[in-house]
Amino acid sequence: MSTWRASLGNTILVFCLKVFQNSRALFLRTFGLPFARYLNFILPSEFKMSLNGFGEHTRSASHAGSWYNANQRDLDRQLTKWLDNAGPRIGTARALISPHAGYSYCGETAAYAFKQVVSSAVERVFILGPSHVVALNGCAITTCSKYRTPLGDLIVDHKINEELRATRHFDLMDRRDEESEHSIEMQLPFIAKVMGSKRYTIVPVLVGSLPGSRQQTYGNIFAHYMEDPRNLFVISSDFCHWGERFSFSPYDRHSSIPIYEQITNMDKQGMSAIETLNPAAFNDYLKKTQNTICGRNPILIMLQAAEHFRISNNHTHEFRFLHYTQSNKVRSSVDSSVSYASGVLFVHPN
């Protein structure tokens, strides 16, 4: 009987461990910190767990081979070509907006923003991406220690994650949802490419809904980091998703202007609002147009942080969009398209 009980006990422990490994946030919410400490006490050393929720797992490049090239050499050549064709560097990016669709659609556009990254100035990259696969209230950070790309692994900055966690405004990503989400991953090969051999860390942040004053809350938190010129913010967002499959297809049926140009005009109104660096202007634009900009909340966090940062110092801030395109030129109501734009925040000392 004692052998049977021991076997059952081990089975339960292994089950709990697998639950923990798959979803640390869920485990800690369900079983609580005391039980996690108990497991840490009785498990062999190879199964020890980090009680702050951060572990030694590596997030795979789950969209490589489908959304972008999985071959290191071919991907590197592709990124090099796009970056070489993106024109001259006109400044040093403090933050940027980049699309997150398959590279065949948006890689060229993304390159215009990443061309403005000066690797020697950057030690840490914050990546704010919208959640497409799970309903999330607020923001969540990763429990993984590395993010894999075909160009090499990117190291997660757990020191910053612990600081963010201490604010009590950040949840932990579920690992299965994290693997499925593409908005952060699609920025990583470009980051790896432009940073090259420079030593740096990343801080992936998944952004959900931001009701009430939460835009300002997160903006104030990230303003502290945006003030530091060693930090780069990458904001992941596509622009208009137009068509019946997106449940969004407004256009003026009486206008002679093609639908794709009407979409362009709507997007560029939003881009102009972002370039003012006024969160209220962008919020008003979204309420007026209901434009399906999936990264609206990461963009709003950036705008709130930039506003707080701008008020607290004597620097001049400039946001400039550099490239815009659409996946398809919509000419009839049965067509569909997604818009892509890239832009950069420059900070100039006075």
Curated annotation (Swiss-Prot):
Gene3D superfamilies: LigB-like
Homology family: Belongs to the MEMO1 family.
PANTHER family: PROTEIN MEMO1
The organism of origin for this protein: Caenorhabditis elegans
Coiled coil: none
Phenotype caused by lack of the gene: 7-38% increase in lifespan compared to wild-type animals. Increased nuclear accumulation of the transcription factor skn-1. Increased resistance to oxidative stress as indicated by an increase in the expression of genes related to the oxidative stress response and activation of the p38 MAPK pathway. Increased reactive oxygen species production. Knockout with bli-3 RNAi rescues the enhanced longevity and increased reactive oxygen species production defects. Knockout with rho-1 RNAi suppresses reactive oxygen species induction and longevity in the memo-1 mutant.
InterPro entries (alphabetical): MEMO1_fam (IPR002737)
Protein known as: Protein memo-1 homolog
Function: Plays a role in the oxidative stress response and the maintenance of longevity by regulating the interaction between GTPase rho-1 and oxidase bli-3. In turn, this serves to modulate bli-3 activity and the control of reactive oxygen species production. May control cell migration by relaying extracellular chemotactic signals to the microtubule cytoskeleton.
Record Pfam families: Memo (PF01875)
Assembly and binders: Interacts with rho-1.
Tissue expression as described in the entry: Expressed in neuronal and non-neuronal cells in the head and tail, pharyngeal cells, spermatheca, distal tip cells, anchor cell and the intestine.
Record's signal peptide: none
